[in-house]
Regions:
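Charged, extended alpha-helical/coiled-coil interaction regions used as scaffolds
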Residues: 468, 482-485
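Extended alpha-helical interaction scaffolds
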Residues: 474-478
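Residue-level signature of catalytic and energy-coupling elements of molecular machines
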Residues: 2, 31, 85, 224, ...
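A conserved structural/catalytic subdomain of Rossmann-like adenosyl-cofactor enzymes
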Residues: 113-471, 490-505, 509-636
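Conserved S-adenosyl-L-methionine
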Residues: 17-124, 129-150, 159-160, 179-182, ...
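Long recognition/docking surfaces used for binding and targeting
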Residues: 1-11
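Conserved adenine-nucleotide phosphate-binding loops and their immediately adjacent elements
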Residues: 12-16
């Protein structure tokens, strides 16, 4: 939304000094989905609280996930930023949200008598390692008994906010807090608090985030997920290392749609994913080896496999078989392709290419099993498109774009969930990128006006028409479907013009040197050429020059004629296309939008993913072949 855009832009431009009040929208959405709120478990009596609410973006993302109206509470130390949060609440139709200004730890504003008020959901992105957290507070004599597990270090207030959150949760409440990675492994007072936190069973999950996501700091952070409900029966903590999934966006990193979906799906399923996520039992966490250290690399190895150089391969030649075996994902699907590419190198454990390096890519693309893979993906996509098309054309006036893209994207993700060699989340990302760039605008237009089209005449500053456009169905789609012959004629004329123009330029270049036909011309044009022809007349000594100048005039005339022809054809095609729009039926509009625009764009994106499979395999095979092509003794000789 507009407010979110302005907040992101302001945080980006302001940097460290002013960016701390804003939690990136992608992180807020991730938390809102991880925490488990939804229309099935929320109503007006559901309460959500952010003790360090900044501009309120995290609370509002939680409310958006709930769908139903819930009751929001927030406290912010900066009076100015609290004012921003109140305005944000009003703009997002939460005028009754209670946003208070003040120091949450020293002067919490939400209380039930002498105790802290408790809430169903608490979310927070507190200042990292707050050095003045205890200002105005005597932790050992805290009236709200927040520090029974221990007092955090004087210069690191991360656990102070976490303990406040725990005290602010109802007996079955759920919470999420963004904190620096240090809270997972720092010792002394924080280690003692962490032990109590683990043993309490309220820490249900940890999500490690990429570095440089947040404004004001580049250090990596994590999301601690809390759940008091059934805490005593909990037997472990679900950990996710999502540090590798992000998009570089200017000088910051940003979670993509696929990153958010992967994190949330994995957490909800509590599904072990090598290198990404696993359920870690309390026994492992409490072991002498780990001693309550929750640092994610202790439990999840997300590092890329090392590309080991093989000494024997360098000395005697041959590609190590283990490097070829490492490409098993390809060979599992295309075993005969491996045989077509590699043969024994004459000794155990080493292989050699069967073909020249230049033939690797053609061999892969032309192999029957790779082509079968291509056909299988095409068939899978065609089946998805066929089954999804009815829901695409059924969307229309008064429809919900948000629900629309959710349904479509989830069906796409499910369709590609078991597709070999393709990452379903990457396919999903293509759809979400297209949604953000184009399809979202189409959906909102359809929701407002239904399946109808309007052309807009474009004018210059003087009010003169300069062209026209249609947002829902761009001109090229209408031309491609109804005027292919005219478009082909236009392209042929353009090609002819390019050829004639090139011939004219070549003639000028060939005869532009010293003492040649065009040597004395400042700029070659028809007037100068004709003047020169009159000047030399029928001079026999200038016969060659005369022929060149006459040839130039003929080429120039051809170029001028072709330009006129091209302009005429373009104007005729433009007029035909413009006249076609009012004649389009609803079925035709749906065909142009759904088939020729939406599904065609997604089909091209899927084809690109298949291309990347061949490129990745080609690159690795070629890399191995080049690495071990010449044994070191041969190089030394």
């Amino acid at each position: 939304d507009a407010y979110e855009y302005l907040m992101r832009h302001f945080a980006t431009e302001s940097g460290k000094s002013k960016g701390q009040f804003y939690t990136p929208a992608e992180v807020s959405r991730t938390i809102a989905q991880l925490i488990g709120i939804g229309p099935h478990n929320s109503n007006r009596q559901t309460t959500a609280y952010d003790p360090t609410c900044g501009s309120g973006s995290l609370l509002l993302k939680l409310a958006a996930e709930a769908v139903n109206k819930i009751t929001l509470y927030g406290q912010e130390v900066s009076a100015t930023t609290a004012g921003l949060a109140r305005m944000n609440m009003i703009l997002h139709d939460f005028p009754d949200a209670s946003v208070q200004s003040g120091n949450t730890l020293a002067d919490p504003k939400f209380k039930d008598g002498e105790r802290l008020k408790t809430f169903d959901y608490v979310v927070a992105n507190p200042p990292f390692s707050d050095k003045s957290w205890s200002s105005g507070l005597t932790p050992d004599a805290d009236p709200f008994q927040r520090f029974g597990w221990g007092v955090p270090p004087a210069k690191q207030g991360d656990y102070a906010y976490l303990l406040h959150i725990l005290r602010s949760l109802k007996a079955s409440g759920k919470g999420a807090c963004i904190l620096p990675h240090g809270v997972l492994f720092r010792g002394n007072a924080e280690g003692a608090i962490r032990k109590q936190l683990v043993d309490s069973g309220t820490l249900v999950g940890i999500v490690g985030l990429p570095a440089n996501l947040f404004y004001g700091t580049g250090i990596p952070a994590c999301i601690l997920l809390l759940d008091k409900d059934n805490a005593n029966a909990r037997r472990g903590i679900f950990m996710i290392d999502a540090s590798k999934g992000f998009l570089k966006d200017g000088n910051k990193n940003r979670l993509r749609e696929q990153d958010i979906h992967r994190i949330v799906d994995t957490f909800r399923k509590a599904q072990d994913v090598p290198g990404f996520a696993r359920m870690v039992g309390f026994d492992e966490i409490r072991s002498a080896k780990n001693d309550y250290n929750l640092n994610l690399p202790r439990y999840i190895d997300s590092s890329a496999a090392e590309d080991v150089q093989d000494i024997e391969g360098h000395l005697q030649g041959g590609i190590p078989q283990r490097d070829v075996d490492a490409l098993h994902a390809y060979w599992d699907k295309m075993p005969a392709l491996r045989t077509a590419l590699f043969a024994s190198a004459g000794r155990p454990g080493y292989l050699q290419l069967r073909l020249p390096q230049a033939d690797i890519k053609p061999a892969i693309l032309g192999h029957g099993q790779f082509q079968a893979f291509q056909h299988a993906v095409a068939a899978l996509h065609a089946q998805w498109a066929k089954s999804t098309r009815p829901s695409l054309v059924d969307f229309g006036q008064n429809g919900s774009p948000k629900q629309f893209i959710h349904t479509v994207s989830e069906s796409l993700l499910a369709a590609y969930a078991k597709a070999p060699l393709l990452d379903a989340y990457s396919i999903y990302q293509h759809l979400m990128d297209y949604w953000a760039q184009t399809m979202q605008d189409d959906a909102y237009l359809l929701a407002a006006e239904g399946w109808q089209v309007h052309t807009t005449v474009e004018t210059n500053k003087k009010g003169k028409a300069t062209g026209w456009a249609c947002d829902l169905i761009p001109k090229p789609l209408v031309v491609a479907r109804y005027f292919a012959a005219e478009q082909q004629a236009l392209e042929a004329a353009a090609t002819a013009l390019d050829t004639a123009s090139s011939a004219l330029e070549a003639l000028e270049e060939e005869h532009g040197g010293e003492d040649m036909a065009f040597a004395g011309f400042d700029k070659v044009n028809a007037a100068q050429v004709k003047d020169r022809l009159r000047e030399i007349g029928k001079d026999k000594d200038a016969a060659e020059e005369r022929d060149v100048l006459k040839a130039w005039l003929k080429h120039a005339e051809d170029v001028a004629d072709l330009k006129k022809q091209l302009k005429t054809l373009d104007a005729e095609l433009d007029a035909k296309a413009f006249a076609q729009y009012p004649q389009l039926s609803v079925d035709e509009i749906q065909t142009l939008v759904v088939d020729d625009k939406w599904l065609a764009a997604l089909s091209a994106a899927v084809h690109g993913e298949v291309e990347r499979v061949s490129q990745a395999l080609t690159k690795r095979v070629k890399e191995l072949a080049e690495r071990y092509a010449a044994p070191l003794p041969q190089l030394a000789a």
